[in-house]
Amino acid sequence: MWRIYTSKYAKLKGVGFLSRRNMQHLFSQVPKTEIPRSRFNRSHGLKTTFDEGYLVPILVDEILPGDTVNLGATLFTRMATLMSPIMDNLYVDTFFFFVPERLVWENFQRMCGEQDNPDDSTDFIFPTITAPTGGWKPQSLADYFGIPTNIENLEVRAEPFRCYNLIYNEWFRDENLQDSVAFTKADKDDEKNYKLLRRGKRHDYFTSALPWPQKGPGVELPFGGNAPIVSSDQYILKPSLSLSSLFPEIKGKGQTVAFANSSSNAGWDSSALYHGGVDTPPKSLSLHPLFADLSAVTAVTINQFREAFQIQKWYERAARGGTRYTEILRSFFGVVSPDARLQRPEYLGGGSHRIDVSVVPQTSATNDISPQANLAAFAVGASKNGGFTKSFTEHGWLIGLVNVRADLTYQQGLNRMWSRSTKFDMYWPTFAHLGEQAILNKEIYAQGNAKDDEAFGYQERYAEYRYFPSMITGKFRSTDPQPLDSWHLAQKFDSLPTLSSQFIEDNPPVNRVVAVTDEPHFLLDAWFDMNCVRPMPVYSVPGLVDHF
């Protein structure tokens, strides 16, 4: 309904007029879309087998804009039969992530209709990968995604595979020791880029060690200028001989030189250089009479000194805190930025529970090797936690992962306290804030040779005073001629380990404690209580094409 307005001027003229504000149509706006949502119970189960150390997919699902997912995970895990009731801890960890579609395919938004220019193409299809010769094998990444195995030339969408690699790169890879795995956003892909991956070991004294004292070059004090080299002795040198031919220690370049043939202390730059004479230099020629005149060098200012200290501090903080952008924000600024804001997989939730070991005593003797009351064991774990509730605003993928890990215990090293020799090897408050100190090789793998005192990695100053390592002694040592190491999961190295990609990969020695080693070590029965509210009708009724 139009409202009639009159102004003072209009009243004088006796004329009314319509408001221009109400005559305008809002061409800059479009009608708001009201999409009704419906609730769907999408609960389901999963039964699978897997090995320890690996990141194993247990859930993969498409997410729509407007979805709200409420998920609860109930897991029952059974371990393969144990030879002994192990005295160690095993844990089952679960992780759930959301990966936006646009992070794993560069043309997704264009396929949906987005254009940089009016004539840009929007004709795209989802990227795919094709099964290799013989098809994907059981217990492969594709198998755990629910794709049929042993079928050649089977073509499937590539995005979940890319999500898996991206999650590994961002969340489970040690950026100081491991290269990122293959990842592409392009339209084409290769199935060879994707395999089951091991998570990194949880951090302790050794696994959190740095490969260098700081993440960057060593900071040097900025001395300036050139220091001339002068001589306090007299030698004779044939002009055709270059300086480097007589002094291999000098690496720089220069012209042919000769020493003064006079009683004066002429030095390098004197005009009294001798240009003839003997064919060979005297045998006593050496570098000892040479020295650098530092009086010509520019001194370091206080500000340069301060700057060098702060740059060193920056490199040390970068080494400790990490240099992924989210790590930089947290380490340097104390800011926790949401994963979605930083264009990375978003962690939704997860959980962890322990596997319980139960003793099985033998009740009848079969032979001398297996007497009555001989102990074996079985191990199971159960949990009902680790879910999440989340509303989503864009297309993407929901990825769930499971992993089994063990406590990290070392048995071949020498505790640092046994190697202290001077007062400066002890703790002193004066030195508490010095830079990183070296972890010696003998702390993780003692050999009794020169390698023992070389650096394995670098840890914070006096870190050995801040924790106490678990120990393995007696016949439990794996190095004993007749070890009882089937009772525990301590690490055993066949040679000196290095702080490397191989060292940081989680690989608990479960093979050592199970009765059958060539079958999967863990059996999983999972139930996902999954309720989704989606922008969809409860039923699709034919004929209601103009309704939603």
Residues of each region from the PLM?
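Intrinsically disordered, low-complexity segments
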Residues: 1-548
